[in-house]
């Protein structure tokens, strides 16, 4: 009986962990927060302000895309990190 209860709890915990990883929450990112999250997603840095990361925000460092831009996709409506990653340079 005890083994069955432990096994049941283990299955529930694993399934909850797996499902939470699959369901990333879409969020809105605007202004400085959008710049900071792009720096983190694309370059693995936390932008502290100032000019030390300014070259990263030049157009040559971001992938050019046709259609809506990152502000349209992630500020005006919620987006997931995968959308933000699609704007990183290759």
From Swiss-Prot:
Coiled-coil annotated spans: none
PROSITE patterns: INSULIN
Key words of the record: Cleavage on pair of basic residues, Disulfide bond, Hormone, Secreted, Signal
GO molecular function, one term: growth factor activity
GO BP of this protein: cell population proliferation; insulin-like growth factor receptor signaling pathway; negative regulation of apoptotic process; positive regulation of cell population proliferation; positive regulation of phosphatidylinositol 3-kinase/protein kinase B signal transduction
SMART domains: IlGF
SUPFAM superfamilies, A to Z: Insulin-like
UniProt propeptide residues: 49-64
TM helices/strands, residue ranges: none
Disulfide bonds: 30-75, 42-88, 74-79
Main location, first listed in the record: secreted
Cellular component terms (Gene Ontology): extracellular space
Chain's role: Brain peptide responsible for activation of prothoracic glands to produce ecdysone in insects.
Assembly behavior: Heterodimer of a B chain and an A chain linked by two disulfide bonds.
Note in the entry: Silk worm has two kinds of PTTH: 4K-PTTH and 22K-PTTH; there are many forms of 4K-PTTH.
Protein name: Bombyxin B-5
Species for this entry: Bombyx mori
Record gene name: BBXB5
